[in-house]
Amino acid sequence: MASKALVLLGLFAVLLVVSEVAAASSATVNSESKETVKPDQRGYGDNGGNYNNGGGYQGGGGNYQGGGGNYQGGGGNYQGGGGRYQGGGGRYQGGGGRYQGGGGRQGGGGSGGSYCRHGCCYRGYNGCSRCCSYAGEAVQTQPGH
């Protein structure tokens, strides 16, 4: 029984030494790679910024909830103005443009001639004013009701 405990203690000591060596070599690699990162680039993707403050995920300028740039395109953001999720002009929730098309979704601007993925949930006299956000949402059949 004592020999098993001694063997386990020896294995633990070897594991501890190996992990310390790996951590030390990882620290030197990280310090070398930090020199190549520009200080103004922060966040998810490229072109500066972060989740809630400038830049964007895969575009440039703007962010998730702020302004300028967007997820995959340019100009605007997820909930703020200008641009949209995949394109340009308008935004996801607030007027002008739309999620993947043109002309507005969830807050003004009309549908711009493109379709609503889950149907139209509010139809005005000039066509669809608000697309459904999920398939089970109630669909309005009469304009203005």
Curated annotation (Swiss-Prot):
Could you tell me which residues the sequence repeats occupy? Answer: 59-65, 66-72, 73-79, 80-86, 87-93, 94-100
Residue ranges of the region described as 6 X 7 AA tandem repeats of G-G-G-G-[NR]-Y-Q: 37-113
Q: Does the keyword Secreted apply?
A: yes
Location comes to: Secreted, Extracellular space, Extracellular matrix
- Reported tissue expression: Predominantly expressed in leaves and stems.
Residues of the signal peptide: 1-23
Say yes or no: keyword Repeat present.
yes
Family membership, please give it. Answer: Belongs to the GRP family.
**Job of this protein:** Regulates the function of the receptor protein kinase WAK1, and namely the phosphorylation of OEE2.
The name this protein goes by in its record: Glycine-rich protein 3
Q: Which organism is it from?
A: Arabidopsis thaliana
